[in-house]
Amino acid sequence: EMSASLVGSEMCIRDSKEDFHIHHGKMVEGTMRYFAEKLGYGDEVDFWGTVGLLHDIDFEMWPEEHCKKAPELLREAGIDERMIHAVVCHGYGLCSDVEPEHEMEKVLFACDELTGLIGAAALMRPSKSCKDMELKSLKKKFKDKRFAAGCDREVIIKGAQMLGWELDELLNETLEAMKTCEDA
């Protein structure tokens, strides 16, 4: 039997033709793996990672049905219902009315947009990397609404609130997470 993470990798690559989507999936996967370890879910690292990898599985081919097409695609691949629920609720309030319940789902909701913002900020740096980025630099980019305008700050703020974290904590931890997976 193939592992969910292997199926996840194959689906992600098959259904994401654009490098950007593959890269985003891998960044969110690495970030989710980091948070699983950090928050005491060490036995679920692969599960959290696979959810991160698959969270936008329907976005590229069916952007109008984002979070609505995913359950069908994932069920066909034999992905379990917990994972499907997590994928669907990452779009809560945007393209889904399924609310994040589990801590893992709240982390995905909170860091999905934020990984995009950090990635965009990294590309502006001479190093093209987030490894030498400091929290104050990220906070400046976060406050500048024109920078990476497609990254919804309200979702990031709402995600921090869902988790019961200060915004700075979410920004800092997600930045640290991305430093661990940037080369993936």
PLM-predicted stretches and their roles:
Residues 41-147, 157:
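Divalent metal-dependent catalytic cores for phosphoryl transfer on phosphate-bearing substrates
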Residues 16-17, 32, 36-39, 77, ...:
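Structural signal for hydrophobic packing residues in well-ordered secondary-structure cores
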Residues 18-46, 60:
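Alpha-helical phosphate/pyrophosphate-handling elements in metalloenzyme active cores
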Residues 18-29, 64, 101, 132, ...:
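Electropositive phosphate-/nucleotide-binding environments in soluble metabolic enzymes
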